[in-house]
C-alpha cells in the first residue's frame, strides 16, 4: 500500500472515532421504503438520526443538526418544495447537504429535481449508482428504474464533471466504489455481491455519508469504506439477504480501527502520488 493510501486509511479510522465521540444529528428527508433501514444504520455506526419532513420545523432542525440528507426515492410534488427549503436552511446554517438522486434519469421529475438541488446546495456531496451519476451530469445513461445498468467506472467522467462544476464530492457506488473530488479519484474494492439484494443499501450509504459529513469528512470516503467493509464481513455468515441485513447492523456497531485496517482495499486512481 502506498503512503498516500495509508494516509487515507488513517483519515478513515480517525473519522470513525470522531463520529462515535460526537454522535452527530443527521436530518433525513428520505423515502418511505428505507426510513427504518437508514435510521438503524446511523444508530449502529454511532450517529443520531431524525426523519424530519415538515417545512415548518426545518429552520429549527438545521440550526442544530450536523448535516442534511436528501433522498428522492419516493419523490412527489409535495416533497419537492420541502427539500428545496431544507437545502436553503442548510445553506443558511453552513451545514453540508448529501444528495441521493435515486432514479435520476428514469423520469424528468427526478432528473430535474436532483439538478435543482445540486445547483442550490453550497456544501454538497452526491452519492448514487453509475447510471444516476451519468444522468445527473447530462450524459446518456442506462438504467432500469432505480437500478444501474452501467458499471461504476463508466461514471467517472460524469462524476468529474459534477465535482468540477459544483465544487463537490461525488460517490459512485458499484462493484468498485469511486470517490471523485476536485483533486483526486479514489477506488475502494470492499463490499459483497449480495449487498444489492437488500433494499436501501445505497440509501444507508448516503445516510452514513451524511453522518461523516457532519463531523467534517464530506468526501464520502469514510462512509464508503465503513459500509463496504461491514457488508463484506456481514455476508460471511449470512444465508441470504435477510440475514445479511441484520448482520450488517451488528457489524457496523462493532466495527473498529483494527478491522478497518485489516479489510480495507483502497487505491488512489488519480492524483500526484508516487
Curated annotation (Swiss-Prot):
<comment type="pathway">
    <text>Cofactor biosynthesis; thiamine diphosphate biosynthesis; 4-methyl-5-(2-phosphoethyl)-thiazole from 5-(2-hydroxyethyl)-4-methylthiazole: step 1/1.</text>
</comment>
<dbReference type="GO" id="GO:0000287">
    <property type="term" value="F:magnesium ion binding"/>
</dbReference>
<keyword id="KW-0479">Metal-binding</keyword>
<keyword id="KW-0808">Transferase</keyword>
<keyword id="KW-0784">Thiamine biosynthesis</keyword>
<protein>
    <recommendedName>
        <fullName>Hydroxyethylthiazole kinase</fullName>
        <ecNumber>2.7.1.50</ecNumber>
    </recommendedName>
</protein>
<keyword id="KW-0460">Magnesium</keyword>
<keyword id="KW-0547">Nucleotide-binding</keyword>
<keyword id="KW-0418">Kinase</keyword>
<dbReference type="GO" id="GO:0009229">
    <property type="term" value="P:thiamine diphosphate biosynthetic process"/>
</dbReference>
<feature type="binding site">
    <location>
        <position position="51"/>
    </location>
    <ligand>
        <name>substrate</name>
    </ligand>
</feature>
<feature type="binding site">
    <location>
        <position position="173"/>
    </location>
    <ligand>
        <name>ATP</name>
    </ligand>
</feature>
<comment type="similarity">
    <text>Belongs to the Thz kinase family.</text>
</comment>
<dbReference type="GO" id="GO:0004417">
    <property type="term" value="F:hydroxyethylthiazole kinase activity"/>
</dbReference>
<dbReference type="InterPro" id="IPR000417">
    <property type="entry name" value="Hyethyz_kinase"/>
</dbReference>
<feature type="binding site">
    <location>
        <position position="127"/>
    </location>
    <ligand>
        <name>ATP</name>
    </ligand>
</feature>
<dbReference type="InterPro" id="IPR029056">
    <property type="entry name" value="Ribokinase-like"/>
</dbReference>
<dbReference type="GO" id="GO:0009228">
    <property type="term" value="P:thiamine biosynthetic process"/>
</dbReference>
<feature type="binding site">
    <location>
        <position position="200"/>
    </location>
    <ligand>
        <name>substrate</name>
    </ligand>
</feature>
<dbReference type="Pfam" id="PF02110">
    <property type="entry name" value="HK"/>
</dbReference>
<comment type="function">
    <text>Catalyzes the phosphorylation of the hydroxyl group of 4-methyl-5-beta-hydroxyethylthiazole (THZ).</text>
</comment>
<keyword id="KW-0067">ATP-binding</keyword>
<dbReference type="GO" id="GO:0005524">
    <property type="term" value="F:ATP binding"/>
</dbReference>
